[in-house]
Amino acid sequence: MDMQSRIRRLFQASIDTKQQAMDILAPHIEQASLVMVNALLNEGKMLACGNGGSAGDAQHFSSELLNRFERERPSLPAIALTTDSSTLTSIANDYSYNEIFSKQIRALGQPGDVLLAISTSGNSANVIQAIQAAHDREMIVVALTGRDGGGMASLLLPEDVEIRVPSTVTARIQEVHLLAIHCLCDLIDSQLFGSEE
């Protein structure tokens, strides 16, 4: 297969996964946006975590809220728990890598805050511990997962929201996660500041 054909195949696989996910995920993304907006209206904040590409997604989400998404508006409170290398390495060194997010949540999380927990497999041990810590702090969890939801899915409470991408391919799951994050940012802005359409 020549390279351009391979590129077209990858584009088509991404398109197919997004089309399959659209109707399945729309109600879950809507519900997640309502949870987040309710928290923001009640002086809550967003915390976000994940590993690798999912860490990048957590940072992307928090930066879109803190700075701006597609229009000028006031900054919104969001913290990516993936960015402080001194904190991450001290917790990993002194305790366990599995606690790098949960210890931060126990310090920063408040009742009514929202945790955006991201894992393509749903089985990242440190994200699972983050969900447990969020529940201990009476936070609501929005979980971005894939495959069968993994261990994260079994931890979620009725008030939590899972956005589970219907795919087993990590790259496709990540692509839909990013689109879901952009949908959340758009919905948050439109609910808080009105639609620009």
Curated annotation (Swiss-Prot):
Pfam families: SIS_2. Its EC number is 5.3.1.28. SUPFAM superfamilies: SIS domain (SSF53697). Substrate binds at N51, G52, G53, E64, N93, D94, S119, T120, S121, S124, Q174. One of its GO terms (biological process) is D-glycero-D-manno-heptose 7-phosphate biosynthetic process. It catalyses: 2 D-sedoheptulose 7-phosphate = D-glycero-alpha-D-manno-heptose 7-phosphate + D-glycero-beta-D-manno-heptose 7-phosphate. It is found in: Cytoplasm. Disulfide bonds: none annotated. It comes from the Bacteria. Its cofactor is Zn(2+). Residues 36-197 form the SIS domain. Its main location: cytoplasm. Binds 1 zinc ion per subunit. NCBIfam families: PRK13936.1 (NF010546). HAMAP family: GmhA. The reaction produces a racemic mixture of D-glycero-alpha-D-manno-heptose 7-phosphate and D-glycero-beta-D-manno-heptose 7-phosphate. Belongs to the SIS family. GmhA subfamily. This is Phosphoheptose isomerase. It comes from Pseudomonas putida (strain W619). The lineage of its organism: Bacteria, Pseudomonadati, Pseudomonadota, Gammaproteobacteria, Pseudomonadales.
